[in-house]
From Swiss-Prot:
Disulfide bonds: none annotated. Part of the biosynthetic pathway for all classes of flavonoids, a large class of secondary plant metabolites, many of which are brightly colored. The record marks Y108 as: Important for catalytic activity. It holds the Pfam family Chalcone. It is an enzyme of class 5 (isomerase). PANTHER family: CHALCONE--FLAVANONE ISOMERASE 1-RELATED, CHALCONE--FLAVONONE ISOMERASE 1-RELATED. Substrate binds at T50, S192. SUPFAM superfamilies: Chalcone isomerase (SSF54626). This is Chalcone--flavanone isomerase. GO terms for molecular function: chalcone isomerase activity.
């Protein structure tokens, strides 16, 4: 088992993402990989909508280090495949989307659904089962309203389930709102944040910077362990 990285909290505007969390749907505590704001230029002003934190299971570090250790933060940030390896990696992931401006559940879920369907149709992988899953996804959000400080929480398992939870007070709830069994949806939701066209470039850069450091720490710890075992 990989030792947990020495993660620290990150503040995005007034939102503080803690170093580790145990979200609904996760089998273990996850560490904070990175965080950043999501915003958009509107009439010459950068309007910030949400803060997004991305958490990973400890074993993400040795899994990613096989290919990516030794790469700089800039090299990782520029690599589409690096983020793809996070999205598809055999470890748990958790995304916390916390409101800076208010948003209705209907607005949020319709936007995410449109994005997912567009991706799947472009890939030629859209099926009737996906239509049913999207309908369930929209249903979960339809009566929700998210005020500033409230959060939408997504836990993605390596088996392909997507656990959705809501928080109105900044705390991570113990119970999930719903679990959807659809690997494509689970992966596309996390990819919408950190993928090639991810909504938060700041979160992507944060993730690359911290994971570059964590992989270096992991490599140094592994070397020290081997040296101690052989008496160096």
């Amino acid at each position: 088992m990989a030792p947990p990285p020495s993660s620290t909290s990150i503040q995005v505007e007034s939102i503080v993402f803690p170093p580790s969390v145990k979200p609904p749907g996760a089998t273990t505590t996850l560490f904070l990989g990175g965080a950043g704001v999501r915003g958009m230029e509107i009439q010459g002003n950068f309007v910030k909508f949400t803060g997004i934190g991305v958490y990973l299971e400890d074993k993400a570090i040795p899994s990613l280090a096989v290919k990516w250790k030794g790469k700089t933060a800039a090299e990782l940030t520029d690599s589409v495949q690096f983020y793809r390896d996070i999205v598809t990696g055999p470890f748990e992931k958790f995304s916390q989307v916390t409101m800076i401006l208010p948003l209705t559940g209907k607005q949020y879920s319709e936007k995410v659904s449109e994005m997912c369907i567009g991706v799947w149709k472009a890939q030629g992988t859209y099926t009737d089962a996906d239509t049913a899953t999207i309908e369930k996804f929209l249903e979960v959000f339809k009566d929700e309203n998210f005020l500033p400080g409230s959060s939408i929480l997504f836990t993605t398992s390596p088996t392909g389930s997507l656990t959705i939870s809501f928080s109105k007070d900044g705390n991570i709830p113990e119970a999930a709102t719903v679990v959807l069994e659809n690997r494509k949806l689970a992966q596309t939701v996390i990819e919408s944040v950190i993928g090639e066209h991810g909504v938060s470039p700041e979160a992507k850069q944060s993730l690359a910077s911290r994971l570059s450091d964590f992989m270096t720490q992991f490599d140094e710890k592994a070397t020290a362990n081997v040296e101690s075992q052989i008496g160096l």
